[in-house]
């Protein structure tokens, strides 16, 4: 069985992301396994400029729509009971999780 598990989390809502990270930290603290992280990765900003007037007559006015993607990485020891508890964590719809066994 692999020794470590790498958990990657990303979301557009930083509050929901921190909520899930705190749940994972609570599980790790209760079980006593080693943990490294959460490591915040750079926030990716995506901008889409859109012209307000679709026909293009008159002044060209632009609106900018922006979305930020926040990411975290957590490395933990891959203990069987910890992994079972991680599968039971309630995750909001806008938070995505990827677990990789290293």
From Swiss-Prot:
Annotated Pfam families: Ribosomal_S10 (PF00338)
Alphabetical UniProt keywords: Ribonucleoprotein, Ribosomal protein
InterPro entries: Ribosomal_uS10 (IPR001848), Ribosomal_uS10_CS (IPR018268), Ribosomal_uS10_dom (IPR027486), Ribosomal_uS10_dom_sf (IPR036838), Ribosomal_uS10_euk/arc (IPR005729)
CC per GO annotation: small ribosomal subunit
Keyword Glycoprotein: no
Domain of life: Archaea
GO terms, molecular function: structural constituent of ribosome; tRNA binding
SUBUNIT field: Part of the 30S ribosomal subunit.
Protein name: Small ribosomal subunit protein uS10
Originating organism: Metallosphaera sedula (strain ATCC 51363 / DSM 5348 / JCM 9185 / NBRC 15509 / TH2)
């Amino acid at each position: 069985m692999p020794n470590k598990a790498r958990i990657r989390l990303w979301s557009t809502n930083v509050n929901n992301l921190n909520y899930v990270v705190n749940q994972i930290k609570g599980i790790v603290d209760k079980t006593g396994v080693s943990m490294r992280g959460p490591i915040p990765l750079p926030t990716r900003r995506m901008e889409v400029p859109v012209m307000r007037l679709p026909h293009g007559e008159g002044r060209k006015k632009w609106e900018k729509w922006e979305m930020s993607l926040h990411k975290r990485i957590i490395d933990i020891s891959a203990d069987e009971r910890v992994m079972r508890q991680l599968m039971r964590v309630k995750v909001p719809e806008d938070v995505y999780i990827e677990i990789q066994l290293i």
